Amino acid sequence: MNSIEFSLLDRTTPNSFISTTSNDLSNWSRLSSLWPLLYGTSCCFIEFASLIGSRFDFDRYGLVPRSSPRQADLILTAGTVTMKMAPSLVRLYEQMPEPKYVIAMGACTITGGMFSTDSYSTVRGVDKLIPVDVYLPGCPPKPEAVIDAITKLRKKISREIYEDRIRLQRENRSFTFTTNHKFRVVCSTNTGNYDQGLLYQPPSTSEIPPETFFKYKSSVSSPEFIN
């Protein structure tokens, strides 16, 4: 194999130094070593599991899955979240050290999905429980979309300031963690009784006046045969 030469990297200077800030150095180290806590409850998590294989290889982004929230700085929620699971999810998020991030993966996590229409126990969006940094829609999203969400989170980490993030999280804490939902009583959609005004009803022949019927009938010319 041919060797690749990098002239800029091979060039050495006796008095070389790197100029940066502590905040940029902290952001660079955190975006290259995200340790996710996998919170999968539905089929969307299977798409994330495919990232472990050699085809996508999520290890190149520095992702190291952890089973303990105290060792993770990223929680990835995938699947439906119910009212009974909400306190445990909030507890896991609170046990994660700062700074911490959240990726909401799939329609069921973001809006409740198809279960949000007639289910009394489904949380209508995980952002009502914990603050979400990246929304990843799809049912389910592809592995390429998961990689794109991780890339966007890395860009967000590289531009943020740690003190401002902590301040915003403390301000949003009062209204973020809630399980109260406003339900509206509506008729069931599975009764089979539909609004007759919305259905198309063709006019019957008895409603057409006889003179109108014979008028259009006489206007049609009979076919002519030519020998």
Swiss-Prot record:
Pfam families per UniProt? Oxidored_q6
Q: Which InterPro entries match?
A: NADH_UbQ_OxRdtase-like_20kDa, NADH_UQ_OxRdtase_20Kd_su
Catalyzed chemical reaction(s): a plastoquinone + NADH + (n+1) H(+)(in) = a plastoquinol + NAD(+) + n H(+)(out); a plastoquinone + NADPH + (n+1) H(+)(in) = a plastoquinol + NADP(+) + n H(+)(out)
Keywords of this entry: 4Fe-4S, Chloroplast, Iron, Iron-sulfur, Membrane, Metal-binding, NAD, NADP, Plastid, Plastoquinone, Quinone, Thylakoid, Translocase, Transport
Is Iron-sulfur found in the keyword set? yes
Cofactor or coenzyme needed: [4Fe-4S] cluster
Q: Which residues bind [4Fe-4S] cluster?
A: 43-44, 108, 139
Tagged with keyword Transport: yes
* The name this protein goes by in its record: NAD(P)H-quinone oxidoreductase subunit K, chloroplastic
Q: Provide the species name.
A: Citrus sinensis (Sweet orange)
From the UniProt record, report the name of the gene that encodes this protein: ndhK
